[in-house]
Amino acid sequence: MSNFDTSFFKDLLKEERRECLEGPGLDLGLHEAFVEACQASQYAKEAKDIAESEEEVEMAKASMEEALEKCVESAKPILDSIDLMESDLEMSLLRTAILVRGGSKGFAKFANQSDLHGQLVETLLNNKKIMKEFLLNGGPTGKKYGNAMKLYTQMMAGLEKDRFYKVNKKIAMAVALEFASPQTEFDTAVEIDAEKRFSHYEKAHRKGELDPAFTYFSTWEYRMAINSDASNEQLQWARNMQMVYAPHITTLYDERWRYNYQVSTDVGYRAPNWTASPRTYQQLLSGGGREGPRAWFGRFMCRAFGIPVWGFKQHPKNVGMSRWTPKGWEMNFQKPGSDFGTCHWDDRSGTHFMEEVNARAAVSESEFYEKVILLECLADACKEKMKKDEEFDFVDPERVWRSLALVQRKILADKVQTDSFQRTGPNVVISKIDKYIQNINEQAPPLPYDKLDNGTIKIPAASFTESNEKKHVRSHQSFDGGNQLHMVDGKGHVTYEIPEDISFQEGIDYMLSLIVATVHLTQQNLQLETNNATSAYEIEIPYTLGEWQETEPIEIEVGALSTMKFSRTKASDCFGLAIKEIILTPC
């Protein structure tokens, strides 16, 4: 097929269009009523756009809602009378839509690059299942249908037909569509390798590193989970870091903040401090930032754990994010009192996005495909053109089929229920997060101190006897077993009492060190006060990038030692400090 030119694809499109136009017609009276309702709706929108006072705006909004309801009512008898699956037009509708959206020039250019590319295009245009999946799941970025087919074929070629096959097939489709048009890593010109991105999420899922719901997302949802601009190495770091440094964030009952709550605790609201080029998400966590960087980090953390994310803007200086939760999509970092109706992302409004989210969640994929996607295909067949990068989000009397698809989507969206967003099913893999939650035992007693044969004493950091409020100091179980302590800010302090059965070797001083994890370049020293010393010791805390690391040992006096109190100095740059263990080693 590599010798086929633009004319071939134009002729093929004409032929497929002809087939489509032999399909269902519209009752003239119903058609006129719907067009009239669409026109009235447009007039109401235009009135709102030019309204000046708040009163005029509110009146125009009410008129728009009333007009839209009339559109819905006039569309219902038309929609009830149409079943595009019965008319034997499915193949022609799919081909037409793909040829229109991919463009004759685009297909010809790709197909003529090599014999393989020609074969890929031929396979795509003759494979109903793949065409359906492409269109059902939003089409490829940049309308690069040929490249999406190439990527999908390459990824599918290496798939094993094991218990992960169904999920991996969806991930492969999501990656192929999302990275059909090349994307680059954060603050670099390095192109993201689609196959490596697929491999990253496939392996992370297989190892149970992702959110428990990841197994059950749709391909359309996967696209918003795997499309991070972070490198695969940074995504892996994000999961490892949070599981070590702040494991409690992976189990928050308020799913809106699960994984991304670390923005509130650790991404300081301040001018960002980038310490190297290119910038990285590790630098962002350490150096802080305002609206933009904080939203970036929240999206990054959610996607690292496989959670679908949609970014948004409310005005040039306000950038936020929305994310999937089992109760529906929710917003983070938005302006107070605002909602999806006040935001947008690129050319898409939040209202438009949420309508599609709700419609897809309310019904099965097959119903959404048959009732919405095929209507959009018919609109392409009827030459109801879309402007470049246009998001068709309002009825248009001159684009009847596209308007019917929009109304149908609204009707489906209105059916959404609270439980429509639950993502559960038969276990393919037990996630580490599920295991962690199952093992949480808030009634478990503190772990005992341990004295080794060489005289070394190990004190579990969570086995303190006294601390101040939980908002400053908290303890929780670790992913790798045992417990850990988290000093949230510079106001926290903890005290340890040496049990009577723990004795020190007489006449010998000891070296004290701690196993800690930190995520900030600048650290406040840890202060140690003991009952047997007149002045406090200072322990330098390293920047560990979220990994467990031992501090440099300091020498302390242990004669008559019975209590140790650890604290830090309150400061604007004093953030979290995770402590796993305190070690006292004889010199």
Language-model region placement:
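Short, solvent-exposed mixed-charge patches
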Residues: 1-2, 587
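Intrinsically disordered, low-complexity N-terminal segments that are enriched in acidic
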Residues: 2-192
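Secondary-structure boundary elements
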Residues: 117-284
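Short, solvent-exposed coil/turn linker segments
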Residues: 83, 103-106, 120, 130, ...
